[in-house]
Regions:
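Active-site acidic/histidine clusters and adjacent loop/turn architecture
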Residues: 1-16
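A generic short-segment signal for beta-strand/edge and adjacent turn/coil regions
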Residues: 12-20, 65-68
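Mid-length scaffold segments of soluble, non-membrane domains
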Residues: 15-60
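Catalytic cores and adjacent binding grooves of peptidoglycan-active enzymes
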Residues: 38-44, 55-144
């Protein structure tokens, strides 16, 4: 799980905006959550990227720009359904990304293996992806 969630944060940092210390929140033991999906932080299966910029319940259209949403859609498409995004939840929380499959799901293990392989190959993986290529845009369209 850590490999996949770190990949999401790295893609955000490389393709949307640089992240600073404190911009990513992951596992917590604080049981106070604003909505059900935030409880995924308790199990370490979710991260929030810049939660103060993109808070729970923010009005749609006030968070990420349309171009940034294209990047998020590409990240989701690249993760093949393993990652869920808070921009698709009610209430909205565009900073929220979570593992969207059950423990032991083979898709999670397959994705983590692929990411680890890309991390070892220069010129591939996070930091080398152009989410605006036509083929990638077509695949990501289902996640907008």
């Amino acid at each position: 799980m850590a490999t996949v969630l770190t990949y999401v944060a790295r893609r955000f940092a490389y393709e949307i905006d640089m992240l600073r210390p404190g911009d990513v929140e992951g596992h917590t033991v604080h049981r106070a959550v604003g909505t059900g999906f935030e409880s995924n932080h308790l199990s370490g299966t979710a991260i929030s990227v810049r939660p103060l910029f993109y808070p729970l319940g923010a009005q749609r259209g006030t968070g990420l720009s349309e171009l940034e949403k294209v990047v998020v859609a590409d990240i989701l498409a690249d993760c093949q359904g393993v990652i869920g995004w808070g921009g698709h939840t009610n209430p909205v929380k565009e900073s929220h990304f979570q593992i969207n499959v059950r423990p032991g799901d083979p898709g999670l293990a397959r994705l983590a293996r692929r990411i680890r392989g890309e991390n070892e190959a220069p010129g591939s993986g996070a930091g080398s992806i152009d989410p605006f290529l036509p083929d990638r845009r077509r695949k990501a369209a289902a996640y907008l």
